[in-house]
C-alpha cells in the first residue's frame, strides 16, 4: 500500500509512526523515529473498557449494578438523586451525569485529596445519567477501580494473563492514583506496535491466534455508538463505520470492520482533528 502522500503530510502533524493492516496482514508502516513506549493518554480508556469486558465475562461485574451498591463504602453523606440512578454502564459512556470533566490531566497534580474515589463521588451529578455527553475521566477511573476491587489486583496484573501476555505485550507501565490504584482513564505506556495489536484484537472480535479470548458480543456491544454522543464504551466512533482508541496528541488505533483493516499511529500533534481528517482521506479511503 502506497502511503507516500500521507507521509508528506504526516511531518506537518508531528506523526512519529503509523502501522496499517489489511486482512490481518501488514499493508504499510512508516516511522519518523525508532519505536519506544509512549504514554497513550486517553487511548488507555479503551483498555479499561476491555478489562471491564473480561470482568463481565467472568461474572465479577454487572453493568446494571447501581453505583451506590458498587461503591457503597465511598459515598458522601448526602447522596445526589441522580447518583442514585447511575449504573456501572454509565461509567463507560461519558454520560455519567456530572456537569464537567474531573480528574483531567492538568488537574490531577493539584489535588490535595488522595482518595480519588470518594472525591469523584462527591462531585455533583447535575444530569440524569445517560442523558448528557460530558467528556470526563471520573467514569473510566471508577470503572478501573471496580475491576481492581473485584479482581483483587491492579489493571496490569489483571490484563496480563488475559490480554497482554497473549498479544506479546510484556508488563507495561500504567499510571496510578495517590493510593496506588491503576488510573483507568489514562497513563498506559505502549509502543505503536503494541497499540496496533490491540486494534487487531478488536478487529478480530476478541480472537487472537484463532482462539476466542473475549466475548464477541462484548466487542460488538462496547464499540457501537450509544444513544447519546458518538461514543461506545470508552471507544470513539468515526467515519467509515470505524471505532477507535484515541489519546491526547493523537495516539490512535482505529478499527475499520467493513474494510477489515486497522490503522494505528502515534504522534505529538496539537491539531488532532486535522490529522484525523487527513488519515481518513489519505489512508482509509485507499483501503
Predicted regions: what they are:
Residues 22, 247-287:
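Structured C-terminal helix/loop/strand segments within mature extracytoplasmic catalytic/sensor domains
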Residues 36, 40, 79-82, 128-135, ...:
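Solvent-exposed loop and edge beta-strand segments that line ligand/cofactor-binding
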Residues 24, 39-64, 91, 143-147, ...:
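Active-site SXXK
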Residues 60-98, 122, 151-190:
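Active-site helix/loop module of the DD-peptidase/beta-lactamase fold
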Residues 27-34, 104-186:
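Catalytic-site signature segments of enzymes, centered on catalytic residues
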Residues 142-146, 184-207, 251-267:
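Active-site-proximal alpha-helical segments within enzyme catalytic domains
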Residues 218-264:
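Active-site Gly/Thr loop motif
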Residues 4-34, 63, 253-254, 260-264:
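A short, well-structured edge-of-sheet supersecondary motif
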Amino acid at each position: 500500500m502506497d502511503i507516500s502522500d500521507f507521509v508528506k503530510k504526516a511531518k506537518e502533524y508531528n506523526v512519529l509512526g503509523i502501522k496499517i493492516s489489511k486482512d490481518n496482514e501488514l499493508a504499510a508502516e512508516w516511522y519518523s523515529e525508532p519505536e519506544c513506549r509512549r504514554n497513550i493518554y486517553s487511548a488507555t480508556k479503551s483498555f479499561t473498557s476491555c478489562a471491564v469486558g473480561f470482568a463481565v465475562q467472568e461474572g465479577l461485574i454487572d453493568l446494571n449494578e447501581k453505583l451506590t451498591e458498587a461503591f457503597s463504602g465511598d459515598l458522601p453523606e448526602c447522596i445526589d438523586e441522580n447518583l442514585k440512578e447511575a449504573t456501572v454502564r454509565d461509567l463507560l459512556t461519558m454520560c455519567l451525569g456530572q456537569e464537567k470533566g474531573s480528574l483531567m490531566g492538568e488537574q490531577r497534580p493539584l489535588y490535595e485529596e488522595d482518595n480519588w474515589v470518594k472525591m469523584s463521588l462527591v462531585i455533583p451529578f447535575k444530569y440524569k445519567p445517560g442523558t448528557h455527553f460530558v467528556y470526563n475521566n471520573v467514569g473510566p477511573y471508577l470503572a478501573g477501580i471496580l475491576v481492581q476491587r473485584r479482581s483483587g489486583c491492579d489493571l496490569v496484573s489483571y490484563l496480563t494473563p488475559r490480554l497482554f501476555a497473549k498479544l506479546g505485550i510484556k508488563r507495561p507501565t500504567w499510571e496510578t492514583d495517590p493510593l496506588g490504584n491503576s488510573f483507568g482513564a489514562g497513563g498506559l505506556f505502549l509502543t505503536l506496535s503494541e497499540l496496533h495489536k490491540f486494534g487487531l484484537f478488536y478487529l478480530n472480535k476478541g480472537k487472537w491466534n484463532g482462539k476466542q479470548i473475549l466475548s464477541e458480543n462484548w466487542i460488538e456491544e462496547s464499540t457501537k455508538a450509544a444513544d447519546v454522543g458518538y461514543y461506545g464504551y470508552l471507544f470513539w466512533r468515526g467515519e467509515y463505520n470505524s471505532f477507535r482508541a484515541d489519546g491526547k496528541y493523537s495516539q490512535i488505533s482505529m478499527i475499520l470492520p467493513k474494510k477489515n483493516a486497522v490503522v494505528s499511529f502515534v504522534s505529538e500533534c496539537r491539531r488532532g482533528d486535522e490529522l484525523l481528517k487527513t488519515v481518513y482521506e489519505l489512508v482509509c479511503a485507499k483501503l
